[in-house]
Design a protein with these regions (language model features):
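Terminus-proximal functional modules
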Residues: 2-100
Length: 100
């Protein structure tokens, strides 16, 4: 069978369309977490937007990597959620709301 450019372009467009919902879902995924610094001990609660998978396991490594650059150690990921559950978390997270 002879494939034309139109067939190849159509197949590529279909694959792209199938991949877009996952990218959109990841962009609308958030997590809240607790972190600490030592000497002196400091604790914080924060909210981040996740760039990768919307799961606690993925969030753990992603958040730990982001906050490490400022000397923070991740204690735990409390939850993973979508934008509809962001309401009210800004006041609790304060300075650490979407900081990382």
């Amino acid at each position: 069978m002879r494939y034309t450019f139109r067939h190849i372009a159509l197949a590529g467009a279909m694959l792209l369309a199938l991949a877009l919902p996952d990218a959109a879902a990841a962009a609308d995924c958030f997590a809240d977490y607790k972190a600490k610094k030592d000497n002196p001990l400091k604790l914080h609660y924060g909210v981040v937007q996740l760039r990768q998978d919307c799961s606690k396991d993925s969030a753990r490594s992603e958040i730990a990597k982001r906050i490490r650059r400022d000397g923070w150690t991740l204690l735990n990921v409390l939850s993973v959620f979508d934008a509809s559950q962001l309401s009210g978390k800004e006041s609790s997270a304060g300075h650490f709301y979407l900081r990382y």
